[in-house]
């Protein structure tokens, strides 16, 4: 697993992989951040560059095949089926693909194939796509092919699989095939898609089903107390972790472990992560609250008009969401608009007229 920016939470979550049966003597999980090398050192500058910087690690195992996965996608796939497809076609590279609406295809790398599923053309995020068969960012490489391509393109700035490795391999005539996948798949690389994918989990029969007996989802569990739901609490369509205390209302929301929602509070269409606290009579609408945050009493988060662009990062803090960073404190009696971001221990003096208008950003320390 290759990590980079602020990896502590992910590293802690994965650990040595016990919940996924990955704590093995042979194989298992290794977390590989960028590191100081004898010749040079730098952060990973692209997806393929990250693999290249760990070439020695792969050479130690000398695999026959290398499976490369993105870390911000949600789906269920049996990779053995894809590997069998790769072997049956004597492929050098197999790329997992999924049909998407043609009007959305420009967001992805797309490919054109022949009747045998061999890729004839590949375009990375074309302005005018000629195919709706989109790359899922999942690849199987025969090891010698991958190694040679990485070495040849090692000086390519920001070396990326879609932009550089695949076109290079296609131009030299490698056998590249498209493995078509038709299940649920979502790229959660934006706050909007992350929020949307969480909201989909609380449908009566979610498209991405967490409850299938034949395909269980495992995670790292904390050993804490059971949930407590007060007699006056109102809960409608919600997923809640262990240790929650719910005294107010929760509607269509995902609530992490050890969260407290106090009396009179109303939470709608929101994601509240572990160990957050929502004060009395506070209203949350389309909010993402990070771990350990404290929201005061009599607050309103998600107030006012829709679609006011965020002034600092309009492409990030969007989708009419309120984004609250880890261990943030919001004082009592504050009203916060949409497309906003708040981080740090804020006080009432940080809110003119007790308000943070839509599209504003308030960051007291660090960054988001």
PLM region descriptions:
Residues 144, 151-368:
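Left-handed beta-helix
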Residues 1-202, 309-315, 319-320, 326-327, ...:
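Unchanged
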